């Protein structure tokens, strides 16, 4: 794809005003662009950094058209917009990301089928439409396996681990509500991710391989560079994926590494990703900078420079009181508070990034300060 470069002062429309939209807007503004954001939440984080705010639901066709008509280019911060709605918008307005990635990836079944056809390494899976299919999953996958809903399921929601026959009842209940996918359970050594930006004329820029740790299905911390020898292999898997799915802008591929050191593609996020937030301080370009460069038709940097090894930790609602007490003592902590009005114990309220010469020591220090987060 080749499209004209946007001039300074042009307007970028963003569908979604959460923290990703906010950080996109901040990158866009420092490059001289104006920003309009559409979000159903009146107090969304992006509202207070955007030049214009449209308060509307994501399926409000009139509001989406208003966004398109007032923007020179439109992007989105998340994958749960209707692909049909997005397809209509792409026929009327300039949306470089298109709708294909959303159409394929918001459904776990079509995502896995696409990855399989692209010849990437994925764990065995079974489509689950009925309770009878769960019995087939036992035959094909064996215990344990994970049942996931085909749609939705952000931050681990809509997932059930089935370890034996006695745990099938909860899976049956989930399948009765909606179609699912069952995946073979992996004995995981490590989780890693690779953030990538594809720009004008399919120029590709890779960020360093990121090592991720989750707690209660929510990303806890990211270490960069990943302590793994799988970066080149991960890039080769991404190349297969980009031949199968149209991308423009920043996206992230999540991987599992099992105890035998085999790399498996887990899932794809077709937009900037939580594990790439460290890049704001730790790289010469952030994942949001390269996203804006891509969708505005600008040339991407040939390579991303990691300025220093880094640990990034998500800040949840339960962390904020401690953070307020400690912040003034730690000028080396790069703090981002997203501006969400309602504080919940397990809600992502911000993140902090520490550049360090000793990643292991920094990890231990953060765990000590935020005691209980490693439980």
From Swiss-Prot:
Q: Does the keyword Ligase apply?
A: yes
Against SUPFAM superfamilies, the record matches this protein to: Glutathione synthetase ATP-binding domain-like, PreATP-grasp domain, Rudiment single hybrid motif
Q: Where does ATP bind?
A: 108, 148, 153-159, 183-186, 191, 214, 266-267
Matching Pfam families: ATP-grasp, PurK_C, RS_preATP-grasp-like
Q: Name one GO cellular component term.
A: cytosol
Q: Which family does it belong to?
A: Belongs to the PurK/PurT family.
The record describes the protein's role as: Catalyzes the ATP-dependent conversion of 5-aminoimidazole ribonucleotide (AIR) and HCO(3)(-) to N5-carboxyaminoimidazole ribonucleotide (N5-CAIR).
Indicate what this protein is called per its UniProt record.
N5-carboxyaminoimidazole ribonucleotide synthase
């Amino acid at each position: 794809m080749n499209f004209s470069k946007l001039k300074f002062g042009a307007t970028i429309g963003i569908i979604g005003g959460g923290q990703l939209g906010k950080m996109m807007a901040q990158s866009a503004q420092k490059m001289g662009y104006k920003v309009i954001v559409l979000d159903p939440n009146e107090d969304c984080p992006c509202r207070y950094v955007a030049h214009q705010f449209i308060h509307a639901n994501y399926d409000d066709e009139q509001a989406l058209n208003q966004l398109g008509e007032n923007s020179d280019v439109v992007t989105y911060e998340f994958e749960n917009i209707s692909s049909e709605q997005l397809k209509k918008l792409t026929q009327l307005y300039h949306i470089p990301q298109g709708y294909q990635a959303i159409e394929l990836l918001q459904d776990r079944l079509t995502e896995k089928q696409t990855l399989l056809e692209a010849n990437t390494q994925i764990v065995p899976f079974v489509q689950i439409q009925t309770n009878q299919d769960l019995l087939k999953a036992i035959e094909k996958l064996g215990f344990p396996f994970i049942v996931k809903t085909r749609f939705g399921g952000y931050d681990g929601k809509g997932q059930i681990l089935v370890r034996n026959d006695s745990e099938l009842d909860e899976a049956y209940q989930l399948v009765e509500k909606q179609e699912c996918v069952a995946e073979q359970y992996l004995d995981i050594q490590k989780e890693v991710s690779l953030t990538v930006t594809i720009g004008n004329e399919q120029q590709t820029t890779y960020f360093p391989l990121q090592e991720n740790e989750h707690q209660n299905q929510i990303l806890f911390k990211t270490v960069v560079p990943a302590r793994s020898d799988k970066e080149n292999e991960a890039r080769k898997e991404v190349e297969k994926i980009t031949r199968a799915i149209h991308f423009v802008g920043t996206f992230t591929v999540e991987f599992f590494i099992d105890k035998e050191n085999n790399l498996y593609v887990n899932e794809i996020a077709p937009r900037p990703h939580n594990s790439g937030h460290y890049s704001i301080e730790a790289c010469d370009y952030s994942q949001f900078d390269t996203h804006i460069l891509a969708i505005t038709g600008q040339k991407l940097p040939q390579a991303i420079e990691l300025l220093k090894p880094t640990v990034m930790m998500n800040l949840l609602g339960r962390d904020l009181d401690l953070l307020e007490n400690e912040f003034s003592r730690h000028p080396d902590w790069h703090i981002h508070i997203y501006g969400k009005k309602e504080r919940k114990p397990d809600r992502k309220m911000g993140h902090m990034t520490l550049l360090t010469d000793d990643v292991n020591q920094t990890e231990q220090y953060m765990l000590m300060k935020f005691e209980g987060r490693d439980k």
